[in-house]
Amino acid sequence: EYQRVLDLYDSAIWPDESSFYLDIQNAASILARLESSNVNVGDRWEHLAKTSEDRKGDHVLMFTEPHYTMALGSAKKHSQIDSQIESLTQHAKISPKSNKHVIENLTQPICRAIQDFYKGNFKSTVDLLMPLRYDYQPIGGSHAQRDVFNFYLIDAAIQSGQLILAKSLLAERVAVHTNSYGSWEKYAHVCAKLGDQKNASFAQSEVSRLSRQLH
């Protein structure tokens, strides 16, 4: 029911192109998750990128920063991301020690990873996110909200041809998110590409099970 999600995005999630940072954050997360499921989101990123560009330099919440990067990266505004990351560097210099640590060790690497993803530098995305994937908590947001970073990691592993890593990440994911249609679908695809027919068949049976439940 992806069209229904897009309709909700337009009518409730980001109906008036709000510039409130939490609205931008939520909108970017939805679009990123939809695109990870191969859903065409139209020109929605372009509109969100313009609003994100206007928020550059406010640094209200470190968790929101990567969401600005998502919007800017999707719209190919990489010079704006470079400016965003440089602004974060300057902000870190005047921040308390704890916030400085978050900026330098989480916010900036995640922003760079997302920028690299949209540049097609998928291996760099993997290299940046892999060491952080169990340590996102200090950046803020809920566990479910931070999970969007794992979408980038898994997709980058697949796109960079690191299928054994992708299989491992997806196996870990479906063990926890047993009703995640998209995760099972990707797991089936990766296992099939690796010649693991047993796990590919099982994953495909889970896709079929969830499809029946959805319809």
Describe every region a protein language model picked out.
Residues 1-212:
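Helix-coil-helix junctions within alpha-helical repeat/solenoid scaffolds
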